[in-house]
Amino acid sequence: MNWITNFVRPRINSVFGRRAIPENLWVKCPETGAMVYHKDLKENQWVISSSDFHMKIPAKERLKFLFDNAKYCLLDQPQVCQDPLKFRDNKKYIDRLKENRSKTGLIDSIVSAVGNVRDFKLVAVVHEFSFIGGSIGIAAGEAIVKSCERAIAEKCPLVMFTASGGARMQEGILSLMQLPRTTIAINMLKDAGLPYIVVLTNPTTGGVTASYAMLGDIHLAEPGAEIGFAGRRVIEQTVREKLPDGFQRSEYLVEHGMIDRIVHRHDIPEVVSSLCKILTKSVQ
C-alpha cells in the first residue's frame, strides 16, 4: 500500500493532473475580445496583429525596439526625497512606491536613455504607465530635466514618449512644480537649437498634456491614443453636451490640427530618425 501511495499515485498525478498555467499566458484584445498569445504579442511590439490595436508597452521594451540592435545607455535616475509630504491615503505613499518598484523593476515612472536610432544619436525619455499611472512627481520631473541637460551636452535631439495620468496626487504642490520645471528644461533644449519630438501614446492626460507633452517641435501619436486634459465624462458633465465620437483620440486630433501625424509603432524608429535628421540639418 505504501508503494502504491508513495510511488504510483504521484506518477499518475504528474501525468494526468492539471498543470499550472501562468496568468499572463494569454492577453485579451480590448477592441475585438480575441485572445492573443503573450509571447506573440511581445514579439510584435505589443501590437495585436489581428486588430492592429496598440497595447500599452513597458518602457524598457519600447527602448529595446526603438534603438538600433536594442543597444542603449540608461541615464542615472536622480536621487530625490522620496516622500516629502509623508502622504497617506488608503496606504502610505512610501509603501506604494515600494510596491510599484517591485512590480516594474524601476525607480520611478520615467526611464531615460541615450543611443542610436537608424545611426542617429538621440536621447529618449519614456513614461512607464504601470508605475502609478505614469504620473509625474519630483523624481520624474528631475529625470526629465537631467535628460534635457544630457541632450544639450551631447548636442542631440530629445524624443519624449508620453503615457501618463498627469501630476502625482501623493506629492501635491511639489508634483505641480514639475510642470514649469520641465517646461523650462524643454525651452533650454530649444534655445540650444536642438529638436524636441513628442510621441503621444495611450493615455496622455492631465498635467503632462498641459506641459511638456504639447511643447514639441513635432507631435506624433500612436493610433487610437487617448490625448487630453480632463476626461470625456468630466467634460460632458461640465459643458452639459454630448461630445463627438472619437473625441480626444489621436485620429480626431490629427483631423483637427492638434497633432502632426499618426505613426504605427513599428514605424516610429524610421520616422523619428528621419525627422531628427531634417530638423537638425535645418538649424546647422
Curated annotation (Swiss-Prot):
Has keyword Transferase?
A: yes
Give compartment(s): Cytoplasm
CoA carboxyltransferase N-terminal domain residues? 25-284
Cite a single GO BP annotation: malonyl-CoA biosynthetic process
Q: Where are the transmembrane segments?
A: none
Could you confirm whether the keyword Lipid biosynthesis appears in this record? yes
- Protein's name in the database: Acetyl-coenzyme A carboxylase carboxyl transferase subunit beta
Q: Which organism is it from?
A: Liberibacter asiaticus (strain psy62)
